Each structure stands twice: as C-alpha cells, then as structure tokens.
C-alpha cells in the first residue's frame, strides 16, 4: 500500500488489507493510499501499495512470490489497460501486480491475512483491525473504512490523489478541467458513496455481528477442517477435492508462510498482501483511480480523450448512476439490512467463503465487487462516467446482452475455475515447478485476466459479483487480459507465479476458507460432489451474477432503476448465495467434514468463489481490468458507479471482514497447522508424509493430483476445476509440469542412476553384501546413492520423510517440490536399488536406510524420523509436498532449499562430471592427486585444515570442487575397483552383512544421522570428508564417507581390488556406516577433516579402541580412524581391509573373520592407524591419520615409506586390503601397513627416533619413541582433532611465522611442509614435536639460535601441528605446512640455527606438495636467503656439526617426520639419520666455507664485471652475461662437469629467475642485491648440488640410479614442474647425482643442512624425497605416467599390487608399500620388488631420481639421503641388500617400498609413488624409502639419496660426472653410514628402528 506497502511487504499486506479494509482502510487510505491511491479509491490504496509500492508493491509482489516466481511485474505488461492500468502501472507498474493483488487478495485476504496476521501482518492489521477487531467489524469497518476511505478517498483523492493534484482529476490523463470536474464529481460521488458506505458500515456492523457469528462458525468449521485436514490432510486430498481444503490450506498456508518467510527473506511478501490490499485499494483505487483516472489518463492520454468523451457521456450516465447508486445505496442499505445479513452475511459469508475460498478471490470479489463496483463507480466517478461509462458502455455497448455477458461470465467463471485449478495446480507446481508455475501463471494469468477482465465487466454491477457487464467486458477484458495475460503472464508469470503461489495459498486457503479451495476447483468437483449445492450456488451465483449482471447491466445500462432493481436483485441473489454460503459454512461447521464442508463451502462458495475468484482475478485484473473497466467504468454512470461502489464497498467490507475472519481462521488454522507441524512433524510427515505417501500412493496413481495436492492441493484443485474447464489447460500445464518434473526426475534419475550405477557397482560388490544387508550396507552404501535417491524416491512417492532425508542429505535437496519431484522421480528410478524406499517412502525404506536416514536425520538435526528415517525434513518434505507446509518449513529450510537446489545443481553438475569423469578416469586419477592437494589447500586455505570447507558452507565451491572431484574419483574408484571390490565385497558381504548389521546399528546410531545417502551425488564431496562433514550436512558427511573411497580411488583407481574395495566399502560401508565413518567420524572430525583418512582412520581407530560404544561416540573419529586403521589392520591382519566401511566391505571381501577382525581392526587398526596400538602390534601405535588428510598423507607416507615394508610384511591380501584401505584411506594403506609394521614399528619407532634423533639426537629418538608410543596411544584418541582445533590458531600463526621467517627459503618450507605432510599421524607429529622439542631444547642448550623455534616446538604446537597435520593430512600440504610451519618454525629454525641443514632439510625433506613442482626452482631461488642462512649456518657449521644430531634431528625430524609420515620411518628415519648423519657429517659437511670460497671465487669474477657495468641498466643481455659468467665460473669451480651441466642449467635458470627481477634496474642500484642474489643462488645451488654430489658419491648404485634418475629426470623434465628441473632434469639429474655423490659428503659434512636449506637441497636426512608433486609433480598430478611406469615396473617386476596411478598414487604408494612390505617381508617379494624396483628403480628410480626434481635424484643418489636414493638405489641395493639388509624385510621392504615409491615418485613417468610421498607427500616416499633402505641397508641406503636429500636443483652433471659422483657417493656411503650414527650405529639403530619404524610406519610420522 502507499503507506502500508512497507508493512505489507511480508505478509502484513494480507492482514493489513482485511483489517486495513476496515479501519486501516481509512488509516491506510487516508494515510497510505491517498498519496498514490487517489487515482483509484480502493485501487489507489492498492495502487499506492502499487504506485508507492508499485515498485514497492512489485517488491511486495516480488517479496510474496519469490518462491513461485519473482512476481515482480505480475501484470506489468498489463499496463496496456488504459486508465486503471496506466495508474495501475504507475502504482502496480504492471497488471501483474493486479493479478498479484488479485491472487494475493484471494490468498492474502484469507490466507495471507491470517498468515500475515500470524506474522508481521499485525502491524498493519493493527491499524486495520483497530476498527475491525473481528471479521464482521472488518466488514463493517471495511465498509466504514471504505466509506471513510472513500469519503476520505474523495478528500484524499482530492488531496492525495492530486498528490499535488487536489482533485482526482489529476488532469494527467484527461483535460485538467474535465478530469478535475470528473474527479470532483467522482470525489463528490465518492463522498456520497463514502457517506453511504459509512451508513452501510453501520449497517454492516450489524451484519458484521451476524457475520461474526457466521464467520465464527466458519472459523470454527474451517479451523476444525483445518485441524482435521492438518491431522488428515490427505484424507481429502485423495481426489481433486480429496485434498482437504484444510490440507491444501495448510499446505498453502505453509506455502504462504514459507513464501512469506521466504519472501520476508526476499522482502517480497508484500505482493501477496498487496493482492488484497491491491484488491481493497483496487476498489478504493478504482474509486480513486476513477477519480484518479485523470492521473491514469495522464498515463493514458490517448484514452484520456476517448475516456474524456466517454466521461462526458458517462457523466450523464454517472449522474444517472449516482441517482441509481443513491437508490442502490438505499436499496442496498435496505438490501444489506435485509439481506445484508444473509446476503451481506450470507453473501458476504459467501463472499467470505468466496474470499476465504478464494481468500484473495473472495476478498477481491468483495473488494473486487467493491473494487469493480467502486472502482467502476469510482471509475465512473473518478473517471467521470466516461471511464465507467466507457467501460460500461464498452461493456454494455460493445458487450453482448447481459445474458450473453452472464454466459460469458459463467464461461469465464468456469475458465477461471479451471484456471484457478490450474493456478492451484501450478501454484503447487510452481513450488514443485516454478517453470510450470510460470506457464501456469501465464495460463492462470490469462484466466485471471479473463477473470479480472470479467471482473472488470462483472464488478461494475456493484451487487453483482460477476457484473453483467463483466460478461462482455469479461470477454473483452478476457481478450484484453488474456492478451495482457499473454503478455503479462509472461511478465506476470513471476507475479503470476506469485499469484499462483498466492493462488496456491489461496487455493489452500480457499479450500479452507471456502471450506475448500477444492470447491473452487471442487466447485466443479463440488458441482460433482455438491453439484446441486455447488451448482446451485454457482448457478444461483451465476444466476445472481446473471441477474446482477443483467441488473447490473441494466443498472450499468441506461436504466438506473433497473440497475438498482437488478442490483437489488443481484444483492438478493448475492445474499442468497451468501446465505447458501453461510448455510454451506454452517453445513461445513456442522459437518466438520473438510470435504463436505469444502464441498459445501465450495458449493456455496463455488459460485461466489468462482465469481470472487473471477473477481479476485478480476481484482488484480481490476487493477488490470480496471484499466479496461475503469475505462469502461469511466463510461459507467457515476451514480451506478457510486451504487456499485457502495454496493461493492459493502460487499468488499463484508467480504473483507469475512476474509479477515477467514484469514484469521486460516491464520489460526495455519498456526494450528504450524503447531501441528512443529508438534507433530512426524504426523505432518506421516499425515503429509503419509498423506504424501498416500498422495504418493495416489500421486503414483494420480501423481499430478496427489503430488499437486500435496504441493498446494492445487492438483486436486486443478483436478476439480481444471478437469471440467481447465482440463485442456490443466492437462497441458500439468502435462508440461509433469514433463518438467519428469525431465527433472529423469535428470535426477540419471544423476541418481549415475551415482547409483557407480554405487551399484560398488553395491554390486556390496550388494552381495547389500543383498543380505541392503538395509545395512546397501542401504548405507546404496543409501548414499539411494538415500538421496531413496529419499528422492520417497519424494517421488512424495513421502515427505524421504524427501526430507534428501533435504538433509542434500541440505535442502527437497527444499522445493520441483526438487522433490525431480528427486521423487529419481527415487522412483532408484527404487530398483531401494524399491522399498520408494515403495515405502516413509515407513518401509529399509531399516538401514531408515536408520541411516534416521541417523542422518538425528545426526543432522535430530529431526523427527518418519518410519522412513528420512523423516528429518519431513515437515520440509511436507513443505515440498504441501507447499504451504513445505514453505512453513522453508522458514527454516529456505536456505536449505536454495542450498538443496544448489546441491541439486551441484549434483547435476557432479553427475555430469561423473559422466565426464567416467570417461576421464586418467584425468581423474591425476585429479585424485590434485584433489589431495586441493583438499590440503582448500581445507587449509578455506577454513582451516579441518573446518575450511567442512565447517563453512561458504566454501560450497570448494565443496563443489571437492564434491566433483570426489565424485569423479569415486566414480573412477567405483569403476576401477568395481570388479575387485565385487570380488572382495563378495567375501566381505557375507561378513559385512553381519558386521554391517552390527555396525549399522551402532554406526547408524552414531553416524546414521549423517548417512551418506547423498554420497552418490556428494560422493565427490566425500573427498574432503571433513570439509563435507564440517558442513554438518548428512550428505556432506556422506561425502566424507566417500572421501576415503575417493582418496582410495585416486590412490587406487585402477587395479586395486581392495581400493575398489576400500573406495567402495567406504563409499558403501561408510555410506552404510556413515554413522561410524561419515556421521560419527566426520562429525567428530568435523573440525578436523580427514580428507583421506578422516572418516576411515578416526572411526577405525576409535572403533578399535571403542568398539561399539566409543564407535558411536568416537566412531565419527573411530569410524574414520577405523577405516584407516582397518586398512592398516586389514593389511596387517588382512582384516582391516577398510575402515569400518572398508572393514565391512573389505571384511566382506576378506573374510567374515576378517570382517570381525577387520572391524576389530577397523577399530584397532584405525586406532593404531590413529596412533592406537596396532592390533598386530598393540605396543606399536600405528599412524593415526585421523584426518583424511592425515590419512592421505599417512597413506602416502605409508605407501611411500612404512606401508610398503609393512605392507610387504603384511600379506598380499593384506596388501590388497590395505591397498584397498589405502585406496580407501590413502593413509590407511600406510596405516594398514603400519599395524603389521607396528611390530617393526616398535623398532622402527626407535629407529625413526634414532634416525630423527640420530640427526638431532638418539636421545630424542628415545624420547620420540616414548612420545610416539605415548602419542600413539594419545593420538589414537583423536587428540589431533581436538588438539589441532585447540591449537589451530597457534598452529597457523606458527606456520605463518615459519613461512614468513623462511620466505627466502621456499624450498626449505616446501620440503619442510612435505616432510610435515609425512607426519600423517598424531603419533608421528607428536614424535616429531617431541623430537623437535628435544632438539630445540638441546639446541637451546647447545645453540640459542637453535632454540628460536622452541616456541613453535611446544608440544601444544606439535599437538596443534599434529592436529593440524591431521587436517594437513587431509590437506596433506597445508596442514603439513602448518605443522611443518610450526614444526619447521621449530625444527627448521633449529636446523637453520644448527645449520642451513634445517632449512635445506626442511625445505628439501618437507616438500610441500602444492609447491613441490613449482617451488623446486622457486625454492632454490628463494633459498637465496637460505644461502644467507646457510652461510650463517656455515658460521654455525661448527655449531651445526656439534648439533648435527639436533640438526640431523631437525632435518631428521623432517626427514624422520617425513619418514614417520612416510611410513617406513625407520627407512626414512634411517635415511634421515643417515642424512642427519649426512647432514651432521656430509650434509653439514657441505663446506659452507668451501661454498663461500667457491662463491667468492665466482663473485670475484662477477663483481669486476658488474663494476664495469655499474652505470648500465640491468638488461636481459647484461643479466644473461652475468648469469653466463656465474655459470661458467660455477662450472670452473664445480668439480663435476656432469654436475655442472645439471647444476649449470638449474643454476642458470635459477639465476635467470633470480636476476630477472633486477631487469630494468640500474646495476649500481641493484648491484649489491644482484651480487647477494647471485651469491645466494650460488650458495643454494652449490650447497645443494654438493649435497647431491655427496649423495651421489655415497653410492655407485646412485650412478645407475643417476642413469635411471636421468631417465626419470627426462621424464620429470616433461612432467616435473620444477623451474629448471623439468628442462634440466635429465642432465642435471646426472650431474646432480654425480655432484651429489661427490659433494654431498663434503657439503653434508660441511653443512648439508645449510646447503640443503639454502639450496633447497635439504640435508639428506631431510629426505629431499619430493612429494609426488615435486618429484612427480606433473607426472603424478598431471599424468599417471610416472605412476604407470612405476606401476608397470612394479607390477611387472613383482607381485606389486600397486595400481600406481594418480589415484593409485596413494594406492600405489600403499601397494608399493604393501607390495614392497609384503615382498620385502617376503624377502623374495622384496627381492622381486627390489628387482622390480631395481629394474624399476634402476629404471624408474633412477628415472625417479631423474624424474624427481634433480635434487630428488641427487637425494636419491646421495646415500646419506637414502630416502630417494633408496628408491633407485634401494631398488638395486635393496635387491642386493634385501637379504643383507639390516632391516630384514622391513627395511628392505621399506627400501623396496621406497624404491617402489621413489620409483613412482622418482620415476614420475610411472608415478608408482604417485600416491607416494615423493609425489604426493613431499618426502614420504623418498625419505621413506631412504630411511627404510638405509636403515635396513645402511651402506646401500647410504648410497641412496632421499628425494628430499636431492637438492631441489641439481648441478647439471653429465653421466660421466654422475658416475664419478656416484663413485664418490659410493665412498660417501660409508660417510652416510658414519653420518647415520657413526656409520654403523645408526644402521643398527635404524635396523632396530626398521621394525620399530614398521610400527612408526604404521605410525607413519609417529616414528618421526
């Protein structure tokens, strides 16, 4: 409204209009309307709502209709209507708003008024209700308000209508004089009319008293009906009239409530109230707009002339009409007094019924009657008779006889009824199908246009609800309005959708208020049901309208007396009709039958409702049609207009009061419904869910009717009305909607089928399991595809429960019925999978689904569970089913609804992505690795490692990305692992059925609240299980459940049966046991996402620790750990094939005993995996990768390091299961390996400790062993989650500090982060923290500088970083960054302080995967500052050497941490100790002084050159000359030409990059910086390559490996994205190896750490084993070539189950680990692996060394850094040393694993370690292998250079140089032996640790 537009925004318009029509009309009309509403008395109020609120009203309209449709320009195109339309345009700006108003009036007068009354309507309605506290008062006051407002209208219309135009003339459209005259006349007449209205209001007050009783009866009846319908919504919804009016009312009330809430959110609720207000203001505005026709005519200057002429003619007629109106007023007063109670009460009751029936329609009827009459009379008055007369003349003259008009009106009524049915249908469908609503809106608006057009014709006889003129004018206006509708419906489609929503609500309200909207629709239904009654009413009303039309026409005709007489007759007819309505209401009240009452009320109301719906439609069309009508009304005599006005004012008042009463009733009903919904959401879902189920049943039979009835009762209405007349339209519209729904269903079905198909592949495997335990695993595994689909099915069946489950799964997937329909059809498609689900939408979804859904419901919101268990959003489902109810829920779920739509869009996109990704499995494999990186980045970057994506839905894009990636990966894993999964699942199914039946209850108890039904859609989301889990959305939790599978999919995409097993089991079992894994584990790890292992490892761990009780509580963590540890234990015990889901599924594969064992070991191994005592070796705390990231990292670490040897130790089946687990839980693979390793892990822990602390200290090793063991136990509890969460800020601050402090040493940070990534488990992290603490404490005592990091070395920081690393395990890089940042800040600073080794160690060993490829060069470049530090470390070299243990410990912490993370922490820690010894001896022995001397020698040559060019600008030529000079000098200074080649290239590229920043600057300005840059680069590179030379010198096998590395480096060149490694990979690798072999002993001895740090050649101990990103950066990420080679070689060479691909990276890492572990544990297997890996490693490992960034190759070459070297070197030496390996089996296995891993990582082409730390985890594989290989094969592994040990940039060496370097490295092997703990000491330690590190491998980084 003008003033009330604002209040009307929400729902207030509705309340405001009814009460506004009473007192608020005066207030509003006086206060609000007349500013804008002068144009039309009632309409000006409406239109002021429209004008002032034309935009505001459009806003209001938009506000109201946002759900169905914007409703913005409901009838904007209706502007064609001349005067009223022009004004309506100005006010409504479109006839769309007229229809909005009409629909709103229909809906709002009753529905929205109550809704608005219930809601914020009261503010406006307060003023409105001031006069009319009750409906009768509303009527009287409406009449009084209308009279007052019309009197004030006249005044205000004079005053405000002028808006500066004192006269209603507002000679805007017409001659100012004529308009002024006309408006003055109109004002006078309006004054008269208002006076009469005041009199009538007095009369109406009496009538209102009567009507109050009647309305009270109506209220009671409707409330009873509403209550009955609330309880039994679908009892009457079975048929078109079957949907009880109350149910429809409730639905529409809920729809309206939801709309209003939504529109309150959208601030577009006004449109619905505006419908009424517009109706009121239409009547008022029509009066005023008649008076304002001048203003309208201003807009319609063309029509001004015509209308002005007509106005002149009509002025005469108007005078007649004034007389007639006076007579009519008297007669009307008499009639109102006489029949006013009955006609006024009866017909008002009937109007009320009509209003309540049409709630807006009847209000419009009353209002429209008044509006039509008033605005007609006002149109004749404001529009001097010309407007009404023109309308009336055009109607009368142009129109047919009144009989024909009555026929037309009746036809139009039928059309309107049909269209109303359609409208209701589409109101329903607009909720279900906004598109359908739009189309329906078009049709309905056309119908409503016709209705409003007829209303334009009709309302003119004030008494005639359907004005006789309305017939012709109806036809005309129908043509006009239909044309306008055609246009306006298109524009107004939004509004019409709003109107339809309102109509929907109105239909429901009408069903309630009319006793049934169905009777509007059921008017035909009632004509059928209450045919005599309804038809009598309708016939009578039609007759009455005919009479009133004819009499109205006669009154509109020139015969004023006849018009009056006919008006009296019409009034009497209306009174009879209203009496019948009242009788019907009484019958309704008496019958309490929603149906009979509906039929009765509808019967009586049908005619009125039709008339009122017509007029309601006419009323917006009065806004529209009032253009035509006002034009025609302008032609009407003002007297007739006044009479019409008064009559219609009275009618409007009565009807408004009735509508208000009905509105109140409806509001009460809505409130009751809402209360019932709130109180009995189950009943709602049962009533509406069961009704939806019934509806679903009948909707299945008559889905349109039932679903639509569910939606808005519209289908029923549509059936009722549209069956007779709207059959064509309705059938078409419904057919369109059904087609749309089917398309959406097909779409969703396809999506669901895609998901289900994939899932059925899994389920096919699990379905054997699922077959027996469909409700258990199938329901969960399938429930992921099927709960979304089952819920979709339930939605298809319209079982709100299922739909609600989908809503929870999808967040709001069924937020809209369209979604529901789509989902419903998906569900219907899904029934094959979950037929019971769809068959039993609520109750008979399998218990598993029920529990899952129920648990998901509980988990999500503890929403009431329907029998379906999907019930949680049951009200929401009802919302969808029952739009009103659904919208009621939408209050709460609107965000969810939009989110559901988004998720559906996501799901559609994801399904498309799934389809695409199914065809791009290799890409997805790469994406799997990228996904791990992305999960690291996203999780860490977005909301923190755990909460980043999960906690914030704000990261929905991240969810989408991860979701899509996960879906891709899941689909790939499903497809790839389908057969293997099926095989193993068949085994597991038998046991899984049992376990899942066992697990399902507890897991469902725990996690069913977060079942993974959306997994099919969100399965990709499951990739960041925590992120998804952090969404707290069951679907996301389910996503999380897939995260392990996804992880495994990436890791084990191709050949891992267990990966398919793990991928599927987690998807299926986690789906099946989302409680355990997803819901619980993820819930527990919500803030602590375990992208790879979160759901598995945590759950399994906790499951193991806490079998069932803690499973429920901690199964969130336990389930995650369980998955991971189940993998470990599965591999170690062949039981922990999976986490809980892996366990169930993998157990299914494996054995029932395996299942039980696996479940036990899911718990145990997950516990051990979460650093719980390994089931195999309880003393051993296997890595706990609580976070998926930790799992992934641990899996990578395990794969790369420990898991290999452990897996080798484990059986092949265990390996398979573990690979499955690894695939399932990338960390799980390592974890699974770790349990087996745990026996060795004890030793390995000690070994890792020895390693880590052999650098830093063996004391710290012991401490770490202690800490690791204690931490193993502590970390198994999921402490990393809480610790990380508690310490996240601290961790991040420390990491930020670490990063900021090491900005100049990106490589240090990268490798540090990589190494930290290796710290996959809390155990490893805590051990690393303790080691760091010890190191820091030692260094603090030894070196104050070393103590700089103690702050970050705090155990809390460690724990935080551990916790952090848990997410960083999910975000392998990020959290490891965080941890490494914390840890490096500690360890690195210690190491840095100790010597550059820390920086280089950290940077080298901790390869931050994300930076791995890019940062290799960048890191070297940024190691400039690291050079400075390394020089500082050179100065601290003695200090560093003295603290070599600490330094080695820091690098060893990193290396060992990486080793711990890497799994064979023994191997890696051995390599780290070696490298720490190498760092301590060779790495620190990188003579920084020698480097300084060398650099000085170079700079001595460079400085003079620069001095010569000091005045020159640093041009590219000059810089190139400097670079070439430096390179030449470097070559001169370099001992190895081979190294110089590589180093020259790498250094040249680095120098080029470093010097590039000086380009354009004057040399004298940047000369110093240039020299510093050059010196730093030289120092970094020389130190690094000397380290690499030392490493190369450490073993001759490194020469072979150097060849391999060179080959691999060639491959890496193509793949590695290291700045120069790619281009210089081959040569540099050789040179690097040679150089490393030669120089690393020196440089390592001098300051390997410094050089490593500075040169990114982290000290050998800091195994430079690059993460897959670094070593196989492009290969692993971009291609599976590395993986393929490695896999091929591994698979070729040995029983390596490594399905190394990008996905297999983890899987391959695990398999390599497993295979290596198995084979190594089987010394033959390890021999084979060694042979494999020798061949592969000689190929792939040397290739890997080559492919690995050159520093990786060098590291591999450098025995002191045996991690990488062990790959290639271990491949050779492992084969040779396998038997001789001091790490019998374990270390050899680890070395083999390392070889496999390094092979994959180093042999990037093969990416066998794609999942290996080299590629994915920074140092996991290489350090890992180096450690394992070194520990077990100390001498040989000394020859092995960790990839991390490899300088990030290798000096280019020719093969000859590399061979020389390798020879020197062979010599250095003894150095590395010495370095590794006195040479033999650490061998022994490492050998001892090899087994302990098997545990630490199990513990992954726990050893570290």
UniProtKB/Swiss-Prot annotation:
Keyword Magnesium applies: no
Localization annotation: Cytoplasm, Cytoskeleton; Cytoplasm, Cytoskeleton, Microtubule organizing center, Centrosome; Cytoplasmic granule; Cytoplasm, Cytoskeleton, Microtubule organizing center, Centrosome, Centriolar satellite
The keyword Cytoplasm appears for this protein: yes
Lineage: superkingdom: Eukaryota
Listed Acidic residues bias regions: 442-452, 535-544, 806-830, 1649-1658, 1680-1695
Alphabetical UniProt keywords: Cell projection, Cilium biogenesis/degradation, Coiled coil, Cytoplasm, Cytoskeleton
Coiled coil: 171-212, 301-334, 403-429, 562-592, 636-686, 731-768, 895-927, 970-1000, 1421-1447
InterPro entries for the chain: PCM1_C, Pericentriolar_Pcm1
Annotated Basic and acidic residues bias: 43-60, 520-534, 1103-1117, 1151-1162, 1616-1625, 1881-1897
Pfam families from the UniProt entry: PCM1_C
GO annotation (BP), single: intraciliary transport involved in cilium assembly
Subunit-structure text: Self-associates.
Stated family: Belongs to the PCM1 family.
Name this protein carries in UniProt: Pericentriolar material 1 protein
Species, as recorded: Gallus gallus (Chicken)
Gene behind the chain: PCM1
